[in-house]
């Protein structure tokens, strides 16, 4: 009573196959597709009894990964979705329900994890291994974004990004990367071809943090201020809110070192160009005394972790606001489908909606781009949060 189709990811192929299946299968047979991004509504458009057509999107490797996206098209019957959820639960899987929109839940909400890494690489903020170490070892993601695209396959990852970008009418949040396109054109597809962002034919060296600062700045006067600011003698160590260290140093007339989110053993910093060398070294010394491995990148608004996480949260809120899936299902999908350390909406509540809003507004101001515009649900939650605080 169930068919699961896993043909090539081309709409015309799937439409033809489903039209044939509808002719030969009894009317009660559920017709499902394992597509990762093609519209269920489009696949079912010419099928007899389209209410029995739905998506069952498994994640690789399917025997191991628990998540299944149960996707309804415009005509899919509610009882069909219910049956599929019960069935996947009986297989030991965890279903999440979503409507047929580009990328469903996971392939849509995960796009900023890749796109922000490509942007950092394009702007020569840091080497690939530093970008990956910051997200992996500093934020708790299971793999860095660039090494993950090498593992997925640059051609596959790039094709999904292009598909989502075009399906959303060239929405700038999903803009593909020219650097990734060059890799695909050049046949550097990642681990499967031996070359991608990394050379997989050779053993990769572990990322090493900055050398230990030997100068003894002790005793230092350290005072933790509010909102992520630590005063170390005359130096301000500021957790990023989307401004560059240089802009802050000029405005505050003080040496400034900006630090990314300090959740793990690895922390990433950026220093204002106007800083005396001793001021930056003092901040590094302070962090190393806290047992942190310190990585330094170019002065970059929002840094690596904060801007990536903020964009993921913003995308999850946009999907929630537009009825793609429930809050619980979005969080479950991202934890089980791509092993994020937290569901993005729970993460947003933990980090603070006002802080995320402020960071995105600062990024939008810095770049003058629609890419970083906060969704209206983020604004609503930030306003509600400020009301509770007052």
Role assignments for model-derived ranges:
Residues 1-4, 237:
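N-terminal Rossmann-like NAD(P) cofactor-binding module of classical short-chain dehydrogenase/reductase
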Residues 5, 9:
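Residues immediately C-terminal
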Residues 10-87, 231-289:
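Rossmann-fold NAD(P)-binding glycine/threonine-rich loop
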Residues 64-67, 113, 120:
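Rossmann-like dinucleotide-binding domain for NAD(H)/NADP(H)
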Residues 72-77, 102-110:
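Rossmann-like dinucleotide-binding cores of NAD(P)H-dependent redox enzymes
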Residues 91-94, 101-108, 117-120:
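Conserved anion/nucleotide-ligand pocket segment
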Residues 93-100, 112, 123, 128-390:
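NAD(P)-dependent Rossmann-like dehydrogenase/reductase catalytic/cofactor-binding core
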